[in-house]
């Protein structure tokens, strides 16, 4: 019995030893298999490492990670080494208005923007916080301006605001930037001008294709870059990336683009042809009086007649007529409608403030490319007003008026006749001949080149307008109404 028990114990012990040996062998086998598997994985990684992309001589990109789940997660920086991000040269808040998009005029809409100047571009953000956001969807809405080939200039005539300059890009986009702080806007103007001057004047400067790829808001490769990395040979990848990197500077491509541009420019119709067909029309405001009258087949602009008629209908007895300013935004709206040659009814409720109508009329005369009193007549009218004898002064004035071009003569006559009706009701509107002379003198006549005698000229301008108004009947007495 004891011997059987001993055998059983020995057998059990042997079994346990056998199990331990088997387990050890199994573990050893598993470890070997794991090492083999790891070795295979390492070899697989080595095979992937061999298919690297050569961009520049002696430089090798990082191997493509195997931990990405699909090709869409392989971002551009895994294939193309990122270009150096240009250093931020200047940033801050300015007032911005986009007035043209691709050559198409836009309504001016001012807004405060956080502006960043870096390298060859300007970026407009809603505020400084948006610039710091890494979210691609947020940054996708950022407006960027390529300064290569752009033009910058001061634009006083584009806005009633002070210190405004304009940036025009080669793509036809136009932006106005403004600040009430003089030294700040001057600093911005000089910084942007310096950035433009550093860039080539050729719009195709630099490697545009690669530059656009880097600026793209998408984190994925372009569609033509979605290729099977296992099947593509290394030399094919190298060749593809070489073409991508150097395509913008390829001589044959440049010659082909130049040839197409030359053909396009040579076939483009002239400005005169477009104007004759009515596709391009000069604006009413800011044009030459002769041009406006010639287009309307008249010697007095239609807009001038409309304004005078409206004022005489409902504004002769309004206090401060022509002296009080109307709402500038409404005046600009009226100006826009006139320039677009849309239907205009000054009896409409939106023009019920008569000061808006008078303000628009004064703006029309003020913005003429040549004043109502032509530049060539300015000195002659000044010499006439200096004469001491009143009769001699009237005769000289009458002689000068007769020699004016028909559009200037007829428009001047209808305007001063209208102003005499304003003076006739001076007891109600409180506008004397002297007041109207001060208002219309600098508007209707000025020297072509102001040489420092601005104050002296202003005195003569007021006196000439006042004298023409006072002696209207005698100056135009020999003419039929």
From Swiss-Prot:
Instruction: List residues of the PH domain.
Output: 87-197
Pfam family of this protein, just one? PH
Write down the Gene3D superfamilies for this protein, in alphabetical order: Pleckstrin-homology domain (PH domain)/Phosphotyrosine-binding domain (PTB) (2.30.29.30), Rho GTPase activation protein (1.10.555.10)
**GO biological process: any one?**
regulation of cell shape
Give the matching InterPro entries: PH-like_dom_sf, PH_domain, Rho-GAP, Rho_GTPase_activation_prot, RhoGAP_dom
Q: Which residues carry this modification: Phosphoserine?
A: 51, 111, 204, 207, 249
Carries keyword Membrane?
A: yes
* Lineage: superkingdom: Eukaryota
Q: Which UniProt keywords apply?
A: Cytoplasm, GTPase activation, Membrane, Phosphoprotein
> Where in the cell does this protein reside?
Cytoplasm; Membrane
A single MF term (Gene Ontology): GTPase activator activity
| Main localization (coarse) | cytoplasm
The residue ranges of the Rho-GAP domain are 287-476
Site, as annotated: Arginine finger: 323
Kindly list any coiled-coil regions of this protein.
none
GO CC terms of this entry: cytoplasm; nucleoplasm; plasma membrane
- Could you tell me the membrane topology recorded for this protein? Peripheral membrane protein
Function statement: GTPase activator for the Rho-type GTPases by converting them to an inactive GDP-bound state. Has activity toward RAC1. Overexpression results in an increase in actin stress fibers and cell contraction.
According to its record, what is known about the domains?
Answer: The PH domain is required for localization to the membrane.
Name assigned to this protein: Rho GTPase-activating protein 15
